[in-house]
A protein has these predicted regions:
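N-terminal Sec-pathway targeting helices
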Residues: 1-2
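A short linear-motif detector with a strong N-terminal bias
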Residues: 17-20, 31, 39, 57-59, ...
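Short beta-strand segments
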Residues: 31-64, 88-92
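Short, structured beta-strand-loop surface elements
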Residues: 66-132
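Short, conserved active-site entrance elements at the starts or edges of catalytic domains
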Residues: 7-46
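Short, flexible coil/linker segments at or flanking structured domains
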Residues: 26-28, 40, 47, 59, ...
Length: 132
């Protein structure tokens, strides 16, 4: 019975926390949370807060939920809000280059234990920014 209750409670709690994080990023774009988290809007309109790492014209994010599947194959266009700046790009999940994933996650998630199996460390999604 406990598991059923937890499964019912968890999505609602996640939605509530995500809404609070999104509001904080929007209202305090120079704050600590906005320095490490962005708001991403998918092509279908879904919106998520997610940690990111920006390097030149690439934005990296590690996705722990199942929504990384939206970026399989040829990927999809996304819109991001990073520290008050609206950016557009094309996002694609990296499934076939474990060395690249480990390299990027070392910078994106430096506190993740090194013994953690790659499949537990989420999926790496790379966004190539569109020029202004």
């Amino acid at each position: 019975m406990f598991v059923i209750g937890l499964l019912a409670w968890l999505p609602a709690r996640t939605q509530q926390v995500n809404a609070q994080v999104i509001e904080e990023i929007r209202t305090n774009p120079q704050g600590a949370r906005a320095g490490r988290s962005m708001i991403i809007t998918l092509a279908d309109g879904r919106v998520y807060p997610v940690n990111y790492l920006r390097e030149d014209d690439l934005v990296f994010m590690g996705i722990d939920g199942r929504w990384w599947r939206a970026f399989q194959g040829s990927g999809e266009p996304v819109e991001m809000l990073i520290q008050g700046q609206r950016l557009r790009g094309h996002a694609q999940v990296v499934l076939d280059n474990p060395e690249y994933v480990v390299d990027v996650f070392a910078r994106l998630r430096p506190k993740a234990p090194s013994w953690l199996p790659l499949w537990l460390n989420g999926k790496l999604v790379v966004v190539t920014l569109q020029p202004d």
